Amino acid sequence: MAKYQVTKTLDVRGEVCPVPDVETKRALQNMKPGEILEVWIDYPMSKERIPETVKKLGHEVLEIEEVGPSEWKIYIKVK
């Protein structure tokens, strides 16, 4: 069973800043409150920047899950 009921998945693996940050913001703009965005990243700096951006926008980071060496999933709840 899935941890979260993901509404949308964004895969920005292979991209470096600022692309993952910009694409995450763009995806969140098109989502409704209560929906969950799952973001796949492999750029370590994005693991720090995306949560900062998300919080500034007023959304909630539910979890940052390490899924492999230098690979993470960030779960974001739209507020």
From Swiss-Prot:
Signal peptide: none
Transmembrane segments: none
Coiled coil: none
Official protein name in the record: Putative sulfur carrier protein TM_0983
Catalytic residues as annotated in Swiss-Prot or TrEMBL: 17
SUPFAM superfamilies in alphabetical order: SirA-like
Superkingdom per UniProt: Bacteria
Pfam families: TusA (PF01206)
CDD domains reported in the protein's UniProt record: SirA_YedF_YeeD
Family: Belongs to the sulfur carrier protein TusA family.
